[in-house]
Amino acid sequence: MFTGIIEAVGNISAITSKGSDFEVSVNCDTLDLADVKIGDSIATNGICLTVVKLTANSYVADLSIETLSRTAFNYYKVGQAVNLEKAMLPTTRFGGHIVSGHVDAVAEVIECRTSGRAIDIWIRVPSQIEKYLSEKGSVTVDGVSLTVNAVTGNEFKLTIVPHTVVETTIADFKVGNKVNIEVDVLARYIERLLLVDKPEDKQSKISMDLLERNGFLL
């Protein structure tokens, strides 16, 4: 599990074919790998990847065809900058929100505009996940935990504060860029609770009113 608080920015140094799958090598000079071992997970632009090889300042992870087909990795080339976060520990400060590293969709940046020292960004997502986005809710974009400032149909707005601009790859976003999106897992759990009809419990205590009174709905 991750929090969406980026620890370092690395870059892809190689993408190597391994039969039907691939390996990706990531250079990460500014990420402390001293406590990382083979088999650990590192979120790489929001994608949970398992470390299979390790050096003092780089790691290698496997990439399946499934990962390539469902994430923006399909668009990456050698030199691509990537946001990095090691899996959280029980002692980690929980500064963002719950991030699984399982990408829900690939979206497109449709507008970038400077607003003082911040950057306003509009992103268009596939229509099937727009229902999970809500104003002032959380979303993960290329591994970064962010707050949704506005939603219009399948498009949403982010305002990126200067610190996040400096510490992540977001400063490099351009119109047309493809980005990894992970919606807030709580939205999916709420949907499941509302949709599941258990034969043994026809009198469910969960209602839209209950969810709203407890702060799950705005």
UniProtKB/Swiss-Prot annotation:
Q: Which GO terms describe its biological process?
A: riboflavin biosynthetic process
- Note the SS bond partners: none
Presence of the UniProt keyword Electron transport in the record = no
Q: What is its EC number?
A: 2.5.1.9
The answer to whether UniProt assigns keyword Acetylation to this entry is no
Q: Which reaction does it catalyse?
A: 2 6,7-dimethyl-8-(1-D-ribityl)lumazine + H(+) = 5-amino-6-(D-ribitylamino)uracil + riboflavin
What are the protein's GO molecular function terms? riboflavin synthase activity
Q: In which residues is 2,4-dihydroxypteridine 1 bound?
A: G4, I5, I6, S145, L146, T147, T159, I160, V161, P162, H163, T164
Matching Pfam families, A to Z?
A: Lum_binding
Keywords assigned by UniProt, alphabetized: Repeat, Riboflavin biosynthesis, Transferase
Which residues does UniProt assign to the signal peptide? none
Q: In which pathway does it act?
A: Cofactor biosynthesis; riboflavin biosynthesis; riboflavin from 2-hydroxy-3-oxobutyl phosphate and 5-amino-6-(D-ribitylamino)uracil: step 2/2
What residue spans do the Lumazine-binding repeats cover?
1-97, 98-194
UniProt-annotated binding residues for 2,4-dihydroxypteridine 2: C48, L49, T50, D62, L63, S64, I65, E66, T67, G101, H102, V103, K136
Oligomeric state and interaction partners are given as:
Homotrimer.
NCBIfam families, per database record: PRK09289.1 (NF006767), PRK13020.1 (NF009566), ribE (TIGR00187)
In Swiss-Prot or TrEMBL terms, this protein is called: Riboflavin synthase
This protein's gene is called: ribE
